[in-house]
A protein has these predicted regions:
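Canonical tetratricopeptide repeat
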Residues: 206, 240, 274, 307-308, ...
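Long, contiguous interaction/recruitment modules in multidomain scaffold/adaptor proteins
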Residues: 97-238, 247, 252-272
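Secondary-structure boundary elements
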Residues: 43-105
């Protein structure tokens, strides 16, 4: 089983902005191995300016949205900007877990995940003269499946507030919390303020994952490397580098990368799980089993752990096992549309159409938006 650990929130064609590529940085980190991917510089990553760039059309949208009718350019509304962004998003937005895009591409394509939507909103708020802060939400481990891989999902939202510029007068509330997954806001998960640099590293990490599952290993290394150099405290980058090293047969380097992630956070269960997978590839079954028992024990109360096991069993045609896993997940949390939809899928596979339809209707009612 392959599992990638990343803050996966989504790949569209990127806008080519007038900007030079960021300089290649010589890294002191021993878990980076440029010698394995000698042509990685042929795959330059987007600069910060490119990721947060807004076209004149997008800036005009912000200007129209924020200025109060009948007021001057100095009278602006946080609430109007946030409302306009959601209105724009609702006109055909596709929420996709694989749509990792720059701010301007998100605006034009209206297909993105919450990281890309948050990047776009941040750029728009800054153009309007507002202050914006990113927050990383501490959600339970939550996976999705894509092309045979399991992806650990993180979640980002932000707060848009009035500027400290005394020449700009805000009309209405002084700030707004912006979250493109309404369930996250309702559940009031704790969150911490994170830097723009960390957000950019998350973006690179997601792009690296896109490249990895497309078997573009050198491109993947370029993105993971950029993320690791920019924000070495981001555990996911080191875990993903470990997956990449394992996939190209460099087991010692994979071990080194997982160890680096665990030195940052010894409770990173995805790093431990990938380490178990590595031991299994090396024929060290006892150590692999020992780690797996520990990981399973610590995850058993997480509905998404059972959910992803159900997804994997369903993919492999083990329908009765899948049903058991989905039922366990449902007992732990019966409000998640993903779990309820899983029940619908497995009942359909088992030929129980009546139950499949019943759970499908429940899933539709629980889904926060039409795309889900």
């Amino acid at each position: 089983m392959n599992r990638l650990c990343l803050v996966f929130l989504l790949s569209c064609a990127l806008v080519g902005c007038a900007s030079t590529s960021p300089p290649v940085v010589l890294s002191p980190y021993p878990a980076l191995h440029d010698e394995l991917f000698t042509s990685y510089e042929a795959f330059p990553v987007e600069t910060e300016e490119e990721v947060f760039y807004l076209s004149p059309e997008a800036k005009a949208f912000v200007d129209r949205a924020t200025i109060i009718s009948g007021g001057s350019a100095h009278h602006k509304s946080v609430k109007k900007l946030v409302s306009a962004i959601f209105d724009h998003s609702e006109m055909g937005l596709l929420y996709r877990n694989n749509a990792n895009s720059t701010a301007d591409t998100t605006f034009n394509n209206r297909a993105a995940n919450c990281l890309s939507l948050s990047i776009m909103t941040y750029a728009m708020a800054q153009h309007a003269g507002f202050e914006a802060k990113f927050y990383e939400v501490d959600i339970p481990e939550y996976w999705t499946r894509r092309e045979g891989f399991s992806f650990l999902n993180g979640h980002i939202n932000l707060r848009v507030g009035i500027s400290k510029d005394p020449t700009v007068m805000n009309i209405g509330p002084s700030f707004a919390d912006v979250d493109f997954d309404p369930q996250m806001l309702r559940n009031h998960f704790p969150r911490i303020n994170v830097t723009k640099k960390r957000i950019l590293a998350m973006f690179y990490n997601n792009k690296g994952a896109d490249a990895l599952i497309s078997n573009s290993y050198t491109r993947a290394y370029s993105y993971f490397r950029a993320a690791a150099v920019l924000a070495p405290e981001l555990e996911q980058s080191w875990v993903n580098l470990g997956v990449l090293y394992r996939m190209v047969g460099e087991f010692d380097y994979a071990q080194q990368s997982y160890d680096y992630a665990l030195n940052l956070n010894e409770n990173n269960l995805t790093a431990w799980e990938n380490l178990a997978i590595l031991h299994r590839h090396k024929g060290e079954m006892d150590r692999a089993d020992e780690i797996k028992v520990m990981v399973d024990f610590r995850r058993k109360s997480n509905p998404f752990y059972h959910f992803i096991l159900g997804e994997q069993a369903l993919e492999e045609g083990r329908y009765e096992e899948a049903l058991t896993f989905y039922q366990r997940a449902l007992r732990l949390d019966n409000t998640r549309h993903e779990v309820v939809f899983g029940m619908s899928k497995v009942y359909y596979a088992l030929g129980d159409i009546s139950s499949a339809e019943r759970f499908l209707k429940r899933a539709v009612l629980l889904a926060p938006n039409e795309q889900d």
